[in-house]
């Protein structure tokens, strides 16, 4: 499928600073795009634009050939966005968070206990998330990736706080998603340790 996700002439201004301008971007099914850049370069701002959570100062973003604004509901159903923050309900347990996502995003049934076990959270399923470590909270947050059917994933620093084993597990999950014709945009400060044949990188320059 061509024209899966395309951005044309994007500009983003924050606090009178031009983070980027005239930025073009294209993503096809099966592709992984890694956005790189120094702290403050505008990576999260770009991801938020691409997720439809904020509006560019100039340019447009098309999903399957149509502007995001005319298909907000379809785009939301096609997207799994996980931001900088974990996005979990800290008062709820891991099991309750999964039940919440399943209801909110109308996800099909799957075995939550087994999923959490495979993410190294066995025995912690019923602990309120506020009592979990940073890496464990991140694992709960990323559990969404094993549940969602959305073809487009936009992930802001998903490896933060994860140990090596969890990083490898997450990259295996990327492979499966890409093999199933999914697409991923990710920001990371470190190089991906596994080989991704479809990987492209984009560097955002820090501008004063
Ligand atoms: N909503 C906002 N209002 C005002 N300024 C903002 C807003 N969002 C981001 N900024 C500013 O835009 C700049 C880029 O922020 P952004 O979070 O996109 O950078 P980043 O490349 O993701 O950085 P990091 O690697 O530190 O996560 C920063 O200087 C930040 O202060």
What are these regions (language model features)?
Residues 55-70, 74-75:
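Conserved ABC transporter NBD signature motif
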Residues 100, 128-135:
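Conserved ABC ATPase signature
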